[in-house]
């Protein structure tokens, strides 16, 4: 029978203690959960947006499989995607995050542009010739006669409480003009 002795005490120097970074189990779990959510965001992307992101072949296959899976199989596949992301380098994960943020931000920029177009249309319809002149200075390629006719028709429709056909046409014209630049 072997005798049990004391565990040998390690002689740590201050330099060695400073190099060791202790990570709690909870922090590891939080990081794993965060990567799993990142994987879920990848699964939710459309195929066109997914093609814009450079992913490892195994990760791309796992994401495509998760998109086809349902219920429990999808949950397991998301766990697997999280595992693949945990084994990825920090640069790869940062690239994925930046790409996802860029895609989400692009959507927000488009929404802001559409709101700006609506506001511009309202200013043109409510405003006077000064607003039109300011618009023409900013967008010299605009068809002046066509836009004036649309604004005049929109004002007339509003006075007569008719359907806002010209109002919608102004918006479409502005959208085509500004977004084509």
Curated annotation (Swiss-Prot):
Organism in which the protein naturally occurs: Actinobacillus succinogenes (strain ATCC 55618 / DSM 22257 / CCUG 43843 / 130Z)
Disulfide bonds: none
Family: Belongs to the DarP family.
Any GO BP: assembly of large subunit precursor of preribosome
The UniProt record lists the keyword RNA-binding: yes
InterPro entries recorded: DarP, DarP_sf
Keywords: Cytoplasm, Ribosome biogenesis, RNA-binding, rRNA-binding
Protein name: Dual-action ribosomal maturation protein DarP
Name of the gene: darP
Source superkingdom: Bacteria
């Amino acid at each position: 029978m072997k005798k049990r002795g004391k565990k040998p005490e390690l002689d740590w120097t201050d330099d060695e203690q400073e190099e060791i970074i202790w990570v709690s189990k909870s922090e590891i779990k939080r990081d794993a959960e965060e990567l799993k959510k990142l994987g879920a965001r990848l699964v939710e992307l459309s195929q066109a947006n997914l093609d814009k992101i450079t992913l490892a072949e195994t990760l791309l296959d796992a994401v495509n499989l998760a998109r086809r899976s349902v219920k429990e199989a999808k949950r397991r596949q998301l766990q697997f995607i999280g595992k693949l992301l945990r084994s990825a380098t920090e640069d790869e994960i940062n690239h994925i995050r930046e790409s996802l943020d860029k895609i989400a931000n692009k959507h927000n920029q488009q929404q802001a542009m559409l709101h700006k177009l609506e506001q511009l249309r309202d200013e043109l319809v409510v405003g006077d010739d000064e607003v039109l002149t300011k618009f023409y200075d900013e967008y010299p390629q605009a068809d002046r006669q066509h836009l004036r006719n649309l604004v005049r028709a929109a004002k007339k429709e509003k006075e007569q409480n008719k359907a806002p056909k010209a109002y919608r046409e102004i918006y479409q014209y502005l959208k085509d003009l500004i977004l084509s630049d």
